């Protein structure tokens, strides 16, 4: 049996931080994304989830339910008939929530400047990160996720608990 000696002369190992930083670190490193692929950009989003780019190492896991997601990734052309459904999905996501608009069609409507196309997802829901390109490479999407992680780490953790009314 091996004997281990611990030298406490230099003090105990202590980590000093705040609760806000700890919560934001946890949030930024465990992003559960709602993969909302509407057109060709969804192919690049699926490639980003594969073994070559391995988004799991960043803590990003794709989910099918908005109730289990914190990040909504809109990739592709959004039609006006589909806009109400998109808003409903966004409203079903728990707070805090973030949105990434991926590709030219999601950002500005792309080449589809018609009456039936929403000319930018930000007209329907608030967007945090825009990824340009047609279709953007997985590296661009990866960079956008890293920017979102930095943004989350800088935000203040909300601890507001609304009192429940009994009457």
Swiss-Prot record:
Report the transmembrane regions from the record: none
What's a single GO CC term here?
A: plasma membrane
What cofactor(s) does the depicted protein rely on?
[4Fe-4S] cluster
Query: EC class of this enzyme?
Result: translocase
Membrane topology of this protein? Peripheral membrane protein
**MF terms per GO, please?**
4 iron, 4 sulfur cluster binding; iron ion binding; NADH dehydrogenase (ubiquinone) activity; NADH:ubiquinone reductase (non-electrogenic) activity; quinone binding
Enumerate the catalysed reactions: a quinone + NADH + 5 H(+)(in) = a quinol + NAD(+) + 4 H(+)(out)
Question: What is this protein's function per UniProt?
Answer: NDH-1 shuttles electrons from NADH, via FMN and iron-sulfur (Fe-S) centers, to quinones in the respiratory chain. The immediate electron acceptor for the enzyme in this species is believed to be ubiquinone. Couples the redox reaction to proton translocation (for every two electrons transferred, four hydrogen ions are translocated across the cytoplasmic membrane), and thus conserves the redox energy in a proton gradient.
Determine if Transport is one of this entry's keywords: yes
Q: For this UniProt record, give its keywords in alphabetical order, as a comma-separated list.
A: 4Fe-4S, Cell inner membrane, Cell membrane, Iron, Iron-sulfur, Membrane, Metal-binding, NAD, Quinone, Translocase, Transport, Ubiquinone
Which note does the record give on the cofactor? Answer: Binds 1 [4Fe-4S] cluster.
Annotated compartments: Cell inner membrane
Assembly description: NDH-1 is composed of 14 different subunits. Subunits NuoB, C, D, E, F, and G constitute the peripheral sector of the complex.
Q: Which InterPro entries match?
A: NADH_UbQ_OxRdtase-like_20kDa, NADH_UQ_OxRdtase_20Kd_su
GO biological process annotations for this chain's record?
aerobic respiration; electron transport coupled proton transport
Entry's EC annotation: 7.1.1.-
Major place of residence = membrane
Q: Which Gene3D superfamilies match?
A: 3.40.50.12280
Which family is it part of?
Answer: Belongs to the complex I 20 kDa subunit family.
Q: What is this protein called?
A: NADH-quinone oxidoreductase subunit B
Record the organism: Campylobacter jejuni (strain RM1221)
